[in-house]
């Protein structure tokens, strides 16, 4: 990029001066009806947006340039944000003059975490900026959603916990101090998966004083954030970033709350992913997730609130109970649900409307939408205040007090205002006597023009005569060439065109001065009136935000009650015990997508309690779950975790009965894949996640483990799985569901008092296997892998060879090295020490005759067996064993 002094034109000097202030952003520079980009920005943007790259002449050089239409800029900005770029919007802040350079200023900087445009934002997703203040071993975190004004802060120990919180919130952008260690901040940003900005360290200083001044309070004690120096430093930096990028004071951020992990159920990234809460494992889609199933909200804020509850389930019994009370009341009252839905429907997105208006980015349509939403609040309040549940009545009470603002906006703003303020006409007649007078002049002018046009046509005989207007010549009379001989001598020629000539008259000049003055006065007055209305809204920002919060809460409660009523969910009993008792539980998403409908789903019981809890003697603390592939082990375990999560977010659950002793954390280790970007194998990923569980699980945690150790050799895998299970039983003592294909782990029940064996039942009918999907007491003897392979369509010759190899393995044949033989003609494995069971407490070589009998028993169709046939079979088996 050239030096500013070398620029050939004043406009290019203006561009370079502006760009120098925003070196890390792509500068959208307004030129007429386009936003233009030059130099490196043009090269970057043209590639990212796949738009044409052209050039602007600069002496002998060509300046790279590209542009996008002003009216379509939103879509292009959104695409750049998706790719992690910042965009500085430089607008013309005065009308173009005839000779002087138009004044231009950056009106806002749009970054991935600083988006207010409703056409760019997902209406049902929060847009969090994460500001981070770092110290050795500890971090302060502030989450700010500029589009709603929500600000919260807290502190965590260690970067791993910090990243967990950043990913849980789904931050779009990070802010660090320029004084922070670069390697550390880069590692955090990579792990969080968000672009990062480095800001002046001064923005993190004197945080408490700056926050008190912004919030207009003598102390932050009332917000519950005292004693969090790092958290407050991050919050102050987040506010500074918002004010700087949006060129406005963020008055809509009128409160701050504590981001606490003490009263919420913690879910790490692996657990949120494995349970498919917001994105599916396959394809990362929203459809097919728990949130998609639960979201029956009417409003966008309600959808965002529901997602927040799903990310942050509670551990406070009183708060859980209050939500459940509200859901229970609405679940049992179909008429009340419909009334509430109808009352919510006219309520627009109060939070985001308020934010745009307060930050100076709103328009007349935003004012109209806000007026309509506020007018609907009294009716909504009445519906809520008539209910019995405390949460519903409280929400209703918080909707009061905005009637005057609603009436004021409704009386001031036209019913269907134009898209931009420049178009004018967005103020209702009767709101301003001065404006009404100016408008009358302008409208009378239209009639005057029509009358003059008719009069001059009659006087001159020029039937095609037109009175027209443009910004260069003002009003003029247009005459085509064939009629020029009819032009009167008192007309003054102004311009010759291809098709004719343009003239003015003294009468038309006088009219123009009068009308143009009126238009200028009208535009200026409408701008002042709009600003007054915007300030009136800003003055009521705290009340509007309170009402918006109440609307979101009521809508989220309605959504949970709709799902509960339609799907037959029940109210869970949530208490301080350490038991987990789910009777006839169902996986909420799986049952909803079954081709034959929810009735086809086979429910299951999950009964488990922490070791030492009164219920542990009956239920056990660690459930070893075995069974064939595809039998439903993973589904049963996931559904147990989802039932706990639903209960602690205050929702009804898919079960006949459920008792949930409070859980502090849910851990899941279900499936794995390579992490090539970080150089980690499948097994390394599996072991890393397992290590995190063993280090962080407590007695109150729920641990769900599926196929631990399968990524390595059989002996290594069994050894690791056994040791992990022992640790969870002996040391942690938490509620654990442990699915495995290592049938040796069933012997844990002989050695550990709180281990119970469960299996998913199957039925063999001839050479077919029927999966019953039912969890029953006992263990499995086979995994039926070959049968599943057959269902998957493996070639017959491959299946036959697999059966042959399996037969050798089951006969305990070994090769010369003592390993299971995969080919025929090997010697039998000798001695008990060679058997895998010997690793954990004794085993004996297999008896071939007994194996044959067992195989025959497994092949029997009991439903078709007559009593006499059974006796004959028994006699034959007895004889063979003797």
Swiss-Prot record:
Gene Ontology biological process terms, A to Z: mismatch repair
Cytoplasm recorded as keyword: no
Signal peptide: none
Pfam families: MutS_I, MutS_II, MutS_III, MutS_IV, MutS_V
SMART domains per the UniProt record, alphabetical: MUTSac, MUTSd
Keywords, ordered alphabetically: ATP-binding, DNA damage, DNA repair, DNA-binding, Nucleotide-binding
GO molecular function, one term: mismatched DNA binding
Xref: CDD domains: ABC_MutS1
Classification via SUPFAM superfamilies: DNA repair protein MutS, domain I, DNA repair protein MutS, domain II, DNA repair protein MutS, domain III, P-loop containing nucleoside triphosphate hydrolases
PROSITE patterns: DNA_MISMATCH_REPAIR_2
Annotated positions binding ATP: 627-634
Cellular component per GO, a single term: cytosol
Spans traversing the lipid bilayer: none
Family membership noted in the UniProt record: Belongs to the DNA mismatch repair MutS family.
Protein's name according to its UniProt entry: DNA mismatch repair protein MutS
Organism, scientific name: Anaeromyxobacter dehalogenans (strain 2CP-1 / ATCC BAA-258)
């Amino acid at each position: 990029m050239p030096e500013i002094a070398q620029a050939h034109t004043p406009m290019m000097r203006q561009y370079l001066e502006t760009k120098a202030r925003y070196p890390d952003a792509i500068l959208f520079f307004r030129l007429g009806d386009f936003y233009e980009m030059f130099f490196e920005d043009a090269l970057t943007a043209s590639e990212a947006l796949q738009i044409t790259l052209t050039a602007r002449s600069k002496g002998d050089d060509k300046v790279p340039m590209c542009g996008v239409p002003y009216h379509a800029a939103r879509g292009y900005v959104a695409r750049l944000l998706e790719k992690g770029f910042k965009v500085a919007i430089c607008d013309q802040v005065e009308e173009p003059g005839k000779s002087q350079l138009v004044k231009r200023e950056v009106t806002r900087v749009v970054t991935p975490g600083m988006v207010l445009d409703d056409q760019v934002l997902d209406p049902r997703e929060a847009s969090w900026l994460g500001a981070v203040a770092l110290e050795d071993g500890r971090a302060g975190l502030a989450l700010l959603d500029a589009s709603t004004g929500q600000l919260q802060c807290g502190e965590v120990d260690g970067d791993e916990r910090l990243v967990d919180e950043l990913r849980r919130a789904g931050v779009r952008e990070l802010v660090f101090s320029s004084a922070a260690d670069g390697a550390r901040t880069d590692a955090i940003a990579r792990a969080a998966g968000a672009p990062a900005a480095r800001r002046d360290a001064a923005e993190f200083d004197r945080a408490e004083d700056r926050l008190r001044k912004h919030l207009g309070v003598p102390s932050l004690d009332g917000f519950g954030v005292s004693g969090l120096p790092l958290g407050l430093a991050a919050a102050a930096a987040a506010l500074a970033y918002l004010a700087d990028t949006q060129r406005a004071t963020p008055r809509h951020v009128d409160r701050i709350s504590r981001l606490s992990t003490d009263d919420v159920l913690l879910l790490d990234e692996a657990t949120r992913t494995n349970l498919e809460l917001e994105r599916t494992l396959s394809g990362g889609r929203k459809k097919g997730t728990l949130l998609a199933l639960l979201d029956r909200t009417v409003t966008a804020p309600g959808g965002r609130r529901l997602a927040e509850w799903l990310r942050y389930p509670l551990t406070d019994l009183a708060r859980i109970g209050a939500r459940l009370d509200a859901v229970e009341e609405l679940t049992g009252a179909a008429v009340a649900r419909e009334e509430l839905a109808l009352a919510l429907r006219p309520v627009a997105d109060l939070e985001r409307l308020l934010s745009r208006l307060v930050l100076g980015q709103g328009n007349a349509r935003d004012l109209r939408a806000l007026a309509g939403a506020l007018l609907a609040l009294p009716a909504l309040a009445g519906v809520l205040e008539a209910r019995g549940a405390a949460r519903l009545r409280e929400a209703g009470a918080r909707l009061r007090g905005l009637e005057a603002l609603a009436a004021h906006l409704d009386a001031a703003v036209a019913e269907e205002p134009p898209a931009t303020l420049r178009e004018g006409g967005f103020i209702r007649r009767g709101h301003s006597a001065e404006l009404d007078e100016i408008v009358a002049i302008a409208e009378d002018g239209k009639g005057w023009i029509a009358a003059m046009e008719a009069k001059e046509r009659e006087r001159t005989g020029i039937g095609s005569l037109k009175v027209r207007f443009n910004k260069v010549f003002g009003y003029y009379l247009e005459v085509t060439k064939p009629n020029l001989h009819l032009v009167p001598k008192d007309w003054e020629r102004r311009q010759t065109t291809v098709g004719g000539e343009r003239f003015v008259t003294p009468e038309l000049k006088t009219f123009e001065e009068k009308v143009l003055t009126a238009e200028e006065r009208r535009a200026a007055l409408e701008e002042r009136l709009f600003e007054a209305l915007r300030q009136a809204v800003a003055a009521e920002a705290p009340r509007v935000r309170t009402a918006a919060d109440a609307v979101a809460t009521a809508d989220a409660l309605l959504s949970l009650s709709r799902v509960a009523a339609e799907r037959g969910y029940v109210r869970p009993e949530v208490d301080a015990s350490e038991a987990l008792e789910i009777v006839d539980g169902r996986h909420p998403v799986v049952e909803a997508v079954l081709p034959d409908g929810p009735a086809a789903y086979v429910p299951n019981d999950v009964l488990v309690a922490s070791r030492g809890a009164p219920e542990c003697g009956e239920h056990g603390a660690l459930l070893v779950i075995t069974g064939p592939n595809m039998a439903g082990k993973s589904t049963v375990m996931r559904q147990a975790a989802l039932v706990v999560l639903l209960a602690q977010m205050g929702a009804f659950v898919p079960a006949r009965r459920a008792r949930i002793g409070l859980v502090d954390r849910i851990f899941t280790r279900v499936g794995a894949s390579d992490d090539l970007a970080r150089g980690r194998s499948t097994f390394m990923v599996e072991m890393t996640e397992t290590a995190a569980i063993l280090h962080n699980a407590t007695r109150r945690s729920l641990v769900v483990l599926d196929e631990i150790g399968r990524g390595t050799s059989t002996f290594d895998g069994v050894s690791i799985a056994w040791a992990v299970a022992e640790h969870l039983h002996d040391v942690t003592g938490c509620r654990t569901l442990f699915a495995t294909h290592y049938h040796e782990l069933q012997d844990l029940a002989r050695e550990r008092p709180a281990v119970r064996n469960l299996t998913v039942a199957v039925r063999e009918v001839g050479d077919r296997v029927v999966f019953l999907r039912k969890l029953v007491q006992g263990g499995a003897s086979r995994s039926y892998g070959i049968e599943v392979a057959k269902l998957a369509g493996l070639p017959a010759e491959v299946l036959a060879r697999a059966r042959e190899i399996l037969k050798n393995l089951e006969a305990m044949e070994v090769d010369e090295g003592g390993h299971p033989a995969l080919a025929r003609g090997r010697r039998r494995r000798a001695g008990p020490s060679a058997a895998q069971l010997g690793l954990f407490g004794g085993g004996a070589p297999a008896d071939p005759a007994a194996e044959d009998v067992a195989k025959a028993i497994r092949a029997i169709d009991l439903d078709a067996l007559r009593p006499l046939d059974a006796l004959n079979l028994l006699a034959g088996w007895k004889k063979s064993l003797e």
